[in-house]
Amino acid sequence: MTVLSGTGVLGHAYISMCLLRLRPQDLPASSTLLLLSAVVYTVTNFVVLIIDVALPEALVLALAVTVVVVAVVNAMLALVRNRQRANQTLSALFGTSVILFVPGYPLLVWMNALREAGQRSNLAETLWLLLFVWSLFIMAHIFRNALSTRLIGGFFAALALDAIIMVASYAVRDWVGAVGA
């Protein structure tokens, strides 16, 4: 039985996944769910990005990050011959990221306001670090299940995905800057 059958609620499923209680395979392997979670993930990335970059650049970056996540996850799953888990894995990654947006966005706005005022807050920085570490645990949990590996393998997969997203984001920002110049 899937989480969405009966009276289950999708938001509750993603929160439970953030608490490491559910696995990606507990979600339905639904293309509709994947599309919905990818769209919401892209929109939340866009909202985060417009804090620091111009609107067109934020849109391109948000779309690029989503494409990178899809490509990298599909490549990882292909390496372990588990491509059938793609929809659930991607839905889990996108959905849990959206859940983390809820505490992350106000924290990001606070840190941005402090930076613009030339100030720092150890509390804000510590909370941001804790949120990042927790997001790695969530991603590691998702990858551990999707790749049928140990938690440490999930951590390496999570770190690899984050590193690839970072490199791709810088490359896209450079490209957008060159096109806009």
What is the predicted role of each segment?
Residues 1-3, 180-181:
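Short, strongly hydrophobic alpha-helical membrane anchors
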Residues 2-91, 95-97:
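Selected alpha-helical membrane-embedding segments in polytopic membrane proteins
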Residues 49-59, 115-120, 173-176:
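Membrane interfacial helix motifs at helix-loop boundaries and amphipathic/re-entrant anchors
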Residues 67-75, 137-138, 167, 171:
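Transmembrane alpha-helix boundary/anchor motif
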Residues 82-154, 158, 164, 168:
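Hydrophobic alpha-helical transmembrane segments and adjacent short intramembrane/lumenal linkers
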